């Protein structure tokens, strides 16, 4: 027992030592490499135009929305400014400034009014209402006496140095009436004359504004614009 180094070991330990010694002395067997199938690695797609478009599409959409919003706000601003300017013009322009249409036939313009000389020979009464009846037939008003004298004198001055009478130029039905002033002339002294007047007609723009005010019922609110 003293000469054997393994005498103190147990049986299972001796078995392990024998097995390990046998493995060391056994020849190494050749190993065989088994080839297996490995799938190829996926290749990255090339950056084509389609891929570039997909990447840029969100940015283009955001730019398009921003542009549409800007254009919409600009159009709204232009529309609101135009509406404000037109409304201000319609509400503030005086109607006198829009009476620029030519006077009707057989009348002539004096400022903002159209004047019509008329003959009163067909009326026998001396009542002042007869001139009102004559002017009322034309939807006009009779002028005061002093205005009538001034207008008839003006017509007489227009005939000085002119071969064609003022009555023919003014398309008056009673041509001798235009040549008469209140003088001692025998022809003129037998004539009874009068003058009717009315506001000058509205221009097409004035008629449009007047109708707009009537539609909005602003005539009684803005009487100073008449």
UniProtKB/Swiss-Prot annotation:
Keyword entries, A-Z: Glycoprotein, Membrane, Signal-anchor, Transmembrane, Transmembrane helix, Viral envelope protein, Virion
Topology class, membrane: Single-pass type II membrane protein
Chief place of localization: virion
Any single Gene Ontology cellular-component annotation: viral envelope
Compartments it resides in: Virion membrane
Virion surface topological segments: 87-219
Residue spans crossing the bilayer: 64-86
UniProt-annotated glycosylation sites, renumbered to this chain: 124, 127, 146, 163, 171, 181
Record topology, Intravirion segments: 1-63
Pfam families referenced in this protein's UniProt entry, alphabetically: UL45 (PF05473)
Similarity comment text for this entry: Belongs to the herpesviridae HHV-1 UL45 family.
Full protein name: Envelope protein UL45 homolog
Organism per entry: Equine herpesvirus 4 (strain 1942)
Lineage: Viruses, Duplodnaviria, Heunggongvirae, Peploviricota, Herviviricetes
């Amino acid at each position: 027992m003293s000469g054997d180094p393994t005498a103190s070991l147990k049986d299972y330990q001796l078995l392990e030592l024998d097995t390990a010694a046998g493995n060391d002395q056994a020849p190494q067997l050749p190993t065989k490499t088994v080839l297996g199938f490995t799938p190829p690695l996926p290749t990255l797609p090339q950056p084509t135009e389609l891929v570039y478009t997909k990447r840029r599409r969100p940015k283009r959409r955001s730019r398009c929305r921003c542009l549409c919003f800007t254009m919409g706000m600009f159009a709204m601003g232009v529309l609101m400014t135009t509406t404000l300017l037109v409304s201000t013009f319609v509400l503030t322009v005086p109607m006198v400034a829009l009476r620029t249409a030519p006077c009707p036939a057989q009348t002539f313009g004096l400022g903002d009014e159209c004047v019509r000389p008329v003959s009163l020979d067909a009326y026998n009464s001396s009542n002042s209402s007869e001139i009102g009846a004559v002017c009322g037939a034309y939807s006009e008003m009779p002028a005061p006496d002093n205005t009538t004298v001034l207008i008839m004198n003006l017509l007489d001055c227009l005939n000085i140095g002119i071969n064609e009478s003022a009555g023919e130029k003014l398309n008056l039905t009673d041509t001798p009436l235009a040549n008469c002033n209140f003088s001692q002339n025998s022809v003129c002294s037998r004539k009874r004359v009068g003058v009717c007047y009315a506001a000058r007609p509205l221009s097409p723009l004035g008629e449009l504004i007047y109708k707009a005010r009537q539609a909005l019922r602003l005539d009684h609110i803005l009487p100073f614009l008449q």
